[in-house]
């Protein structure tokens, strides 16, 4: 099973070395074309190209020379390069800026056309466009369906979405 799954989590590990080193961990025989495609899909290509040393840029211990969003997009590019059948995103956008989050979600939806994608998220706005949403409560599956069908059911998911939207609105007005 492990050989078919890649994971991008909140704290995906970035190795001490270069951007290229971090990518090659996923696929030691990756071609330049595959690397460029992974970087473009992860919305990281322009950033890497803007760096003086490009792919050979040293990222520092645990990616200390990169922002949170850049680290997550590097982890995403690495997952893409691994060419696994399934990619699991476990709260992958929870600790990053809005622009990076938007870029990562665009990449995730692009990937979902060719790969099986599993998104674990407490931010329900992140899963509205998913083909299928599974709602768990205390470890048990309580609902499944599209966003629209779950909202029409006016059950557990509906309540969670409304509570989350109310909370976000109240935070805006503070």
Predicted regions and their residues:
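ABC ATPase nucleotide-binding domain helical subdomain, centered on the C-loop/LSGGQ "ABC signature"
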Residues: 2, 20-61, 105-106, 114
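Conserved catalytic motifs of ABC-family nucleotide-binding domains
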Residues: 11-30, 66, 126-127
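ABC-fold ATPase nucleotide-binding domain signature/coupling loops
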Residues: 45-74, 96-99, 166-171
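C-terminal portion of ABC ATPase nucleotide-binding domains
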Residues: 50, 54, 106, 128-171
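ABC ATPase nucleotide-binding domain "signature" region
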Residues: 67-68, 74-79, 103, 119
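A short, proline-enriched helix->beta-strand linker immediately N-terminal to the Walker B motif
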Residues: 81-85, 114
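Catalytic Walker B motif of ABC-type/P-loop ATPase nucleotide-binding domains
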Residues: 87-91
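Conserved catalytic loops of ABC-family nucleotide-binding domains
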Residues: 110-119, 127
């Amino acid at each position: 099973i492990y050989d078919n799954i890649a994971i991008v989590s909140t704290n995906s590990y970035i190795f001490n070395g270069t951007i290229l080193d971090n990518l090659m961990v996923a696929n030691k025989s990756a071609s330049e074309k595959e690397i460029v495609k992974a970087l473009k899909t992860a919305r990281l290509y322009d950033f890497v190209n803007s760096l003086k040393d490009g792919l050979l840029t040293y990222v520092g211990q645990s990616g200390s020379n990169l922002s949170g969003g850049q680290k997550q997009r590097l982890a995403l590019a690495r997952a893409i390069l691994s060419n696994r059948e399934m990619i699991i995103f476990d709260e992958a956008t929870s600790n990053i800026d809005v622009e990076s989050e938007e870029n990562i979600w665009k990449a995730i939806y692009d990937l979902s056309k060719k790969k099986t994608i599993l998104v674990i998220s407490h931010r329900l706005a992140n899963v509205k466009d998913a083909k299928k949403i599974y709602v768990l409560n205390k470890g048990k599956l309580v609902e499944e369906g599209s966003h629209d069908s779950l909202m029409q059911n006016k059950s557990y998911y509906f309540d969670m979405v409304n509570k989350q939207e109310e909370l976000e609105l109240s935070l805006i007005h503070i």
